[in-house]
Amino acid sequence: MYSKVLVAIDGSPTSDAALDEAIKLAKEQGSTLRLVHVVDEGPAYLNADTPFQLDEYERALHKAGERILEKALARVGAEGLQAETKLIQIVTINEHAADELVAEAQRWPANLIVIGTHGRRGLRRLLLGSVAEGVIRSANQPVLLIRAS
């Protein structure tokens, strides 16, 4: 039984599908959900000639992350469930979303991680990377991958 389920949320349709699956699982097993969104500020620091103020950019990313979590929390609530939310900020290029999700799953501690995957292959996967793949490689608990159709 999965009593504590961490759900990675990024606001994409794939993430929404993962949330739907986590909601079903929580209803069936009486699980507690923790919705986690990772804000990655690192790429903004790669270019010193940014045409915007970094503090404004950081605030915008943080606000967008909060909205994504609020929307996901509302979906959970509409299904008669409750959940906790957690916003994690990455501020250096040495930190990675996958590592932060796995670390949060350990701290909480989750019995299961639910995450959406876009199913990228080839060059797109090489260029864009995969948070889901990084989670699978380093998580100690089971990971449920959900691929949106």
Residue ranges: model-predicted function:
Residues 22, 72, 101, 135:
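Aromatic/hydrophobic pocket-lining residues that form π-stacking "cages" and hydrophobic walls in ligand
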